[in-house]
Amino acid sequence: DYLHLTGREQTHIDFIESYCKMIGIFRTDDDQDPKFSKSLELDLNTITPAISGPLNPEERVTLEEAEERAIEFQEAHISNRSKTAEIKSSKFEYNGQETTLTDGNIVIAAITSCTNTSNPSVLIGAGLLAKKAIEKGLMTQPHIKTSFAPGSLVVTKYMKNLGLDQYLDMLGFHTVGYGCTTCIGNSGPLPIEIDQVIRDDDLYVTSILSGNRNFAGRVHQLTRGNFLASPMLVVAYALAGRTDINITNHVFGIDQDEKEIHLKDIWPSQKEILDAINSGLNPEMY
């Protein structure tokens, strides 16, 4: 199915099938269960969503625990700060408006080409989440530099075909290129005003990206905490504006019915994602 979907020629598909059968790795539902030297039992109820950070890729932390982890590193920086040992809020003018930047704020949010962009489900999921957020009146914070760098032109084709690109654009996740960008430090400079206030007040600011490396200084020299997440969570955290929160119960805003907007209210269902994949992708795109 994957080879058909991605536009491979039938002769190539037949060759792959014949080769896999010849070396014994082509399986059907009618085959006998293979015998394994070892087996592993896993309780699926123990699987929980997670992000990684703030300093290394192996620092996995569940969404519920992420707030405590982020605050721990944030407070360590604040306690060593010479100017003040309290959480700092800095006001400055940006794009003609008074803006506030505080310790813990996100200043870079990027859906990157690393790892995730070969998987349509998470990118379409990010687009659907953006659509739901816009429909509820949510916007990303003005102090965040947002970007979208797919790993393939095909991504742009199916996002446009589904009409989801416009919602990512509205949240600032414009397509900036194809290939390595923010994940290897190629985010470019932060706006001068934001760069200056971070330096002047020694603020603890962070980044969130869908890459696979988050070592100190790799994403940007001024982001002291860097978190790795799925494209959907990158959009969600950008809407929240900070990493020192429990994103699962964070209140993003108030809707038209004066009800609190939570992550579950903008998170697309698996059916919505699968329906979009089935209607939005075709072999001709490849």
Regions found by a protein language model. Name each.
Residues L40-G163:
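Non-catalytic terminal/interface segments that mediate subunit docking, oligomerization
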Residues G24-F26, Q32, C114:
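Noncatalytic alpha-helical scaffolds and linker/capping helices
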